[in-house]
């Protein structure tokens, strides 16, 4: 072949390769720009602090005084302190039992007492709080009267799942904020309100990261603690639970003590290839259910015929978050947040989670075709 033809033949693939390289370069630039744009969106979301979010929510109410915002901010401060102590619980030698029992007759874990003290001290200085109620205390604590500016009651479980600390399982703080009625003289009567009366609720999960879940009645929102700056940052606005997911969370060790309907439901899940996920820490189990979907159950048992979870500061705040995320919550006989409590430590059965999954439980365990759970 003549040299000219050989050169011509060689030039074609070289030209094509150059064209491909140029095209590939343009494509990479476009992809890089899109990726950077996506990263900017994520970073922008993550740079919304809890405090900024609270101020944003406050603007929904022209007459807001900022007092509720201060309470939520104070709870976030307590959460940071507790998160640090939970991470160092073994190093600081505060793991294990305190050697005493709480008002429920349950052995107190040392971190229960420490967490309770932290929250009481942080919230006790807020002039807008009239009453504090804790799982660890027999009676609600009166801080000030309504006539002295006490507009709110705060109820909380300082450290749910604390018995799991020695195995590094996720634990959490649960809280709810109620309005204080100055016309009601007794603290117990004041805090005994239906869950539907809650004005804010949330929980803090101390796990692989520290997560702060919050609702003020306008969606459920997720924040995560950035320890490098010491702030909770928004990672998910208006979280929505999946409508269904074949996952159930229940302590099957109590199966023989469940009412027949609940035993039938568990048998049904086995036949229908459901996955079982149960940690034994309510905050961790509900958080997984809220994020991934499924159903969390704590039925009545022979040992606890009225249920085991506390209505006012465990079931109600979790139900508020669940409903605001599009889920359902029931005691088995009615919507959880419609129950009128009679005492601070009142217990209740509980079923909550994805709407379709709660409906399955109600259909099998209670013979209800479809659970509307009307408000």
Predicted segments — roles?
Residues 1-38:
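Polybasic, lysine-enriched low-complexity intrinsically disordered terminal tails
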Residues 106-111:
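Alpha/propeptide regions of enzymes that mature by internal proteolysis
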Residues 30-93, 100-102, 113-375:
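IMPase-like, lithium-sensitive Mg2+-dependent phosphomonoesterase catalytic core
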């Amino acid at each position: 072949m003549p040299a000219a033809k050989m050169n011509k033949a060689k030039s074609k693939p070289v030209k094509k390769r150059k064209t491909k390289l140029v095209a590939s370069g343009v494509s990479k630039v476009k992809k890089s720009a899109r990726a950077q744009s996506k990263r900017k969106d994520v970073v922008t979301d993550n740079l919304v602090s809890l405090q900024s979010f609270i101020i944003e929510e406050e603007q929904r109410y022209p007459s807001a005084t900022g007092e509720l915002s201060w309470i939520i901010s104070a709870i976030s401060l307590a959460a940071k302190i507790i998160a640090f102590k939970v991470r160092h619980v073994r190093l600081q030698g505060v793991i294990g039992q305190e050697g005493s029992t709480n008002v429920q007759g349950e052995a107190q874990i040392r971190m229960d007492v420490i967490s309770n003290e932290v929250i009481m001290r942080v919230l006790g200085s807020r002039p807008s709080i009239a009453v504090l109620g804790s799982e660890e205390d027999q009676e609600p604590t009166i801080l000030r009267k309504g006539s002295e500016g006490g507009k709110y009651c705060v109820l909380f479980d300082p450290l749910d799942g604390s018995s799991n600390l020695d195995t590094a399982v996720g634990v959490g703080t649960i809280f709810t904020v109620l309005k204080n009625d100055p016309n009601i003289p007794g603290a117990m009567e004041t805090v005994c309100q239906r869950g539907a009366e809650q004005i804010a609720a949330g929980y803090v999960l101390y796990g692989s990261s520290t997560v702060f879940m919050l609702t003020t009645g306008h969606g459920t929102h997720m924040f995560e603690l950035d320890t490098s700056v010491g702030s909770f940052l928004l990672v998910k606005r208006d979280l929505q639970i999946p409508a269904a997911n074949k996952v159930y969370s229940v302590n099957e060790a109590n199966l023989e003590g469940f009412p027949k309907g609940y035993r039938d439901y568990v048998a049904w899940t086995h036949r229908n290839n459901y996955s079982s996920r149960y940690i034994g820490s309510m905050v961790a189990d509900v958080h997984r259910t809220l994020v991934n979907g499924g159903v969390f159950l704590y039925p009545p048992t022979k040992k606890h015929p009225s249920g085991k979870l506390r209505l006012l500061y465990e079931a109600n705040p979790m139900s508020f978050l669940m409903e605001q995320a599009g889920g359902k919550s029931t005691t088995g006989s009615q919507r959880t947040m419609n129950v009128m409590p009679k005492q601070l430590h009142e217990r209740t059965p509980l079923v909550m989670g994805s709407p379709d999954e709660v409906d399955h439980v109600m259909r099998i365990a209670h013979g209800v075709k479809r659970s509307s759970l009307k408000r």
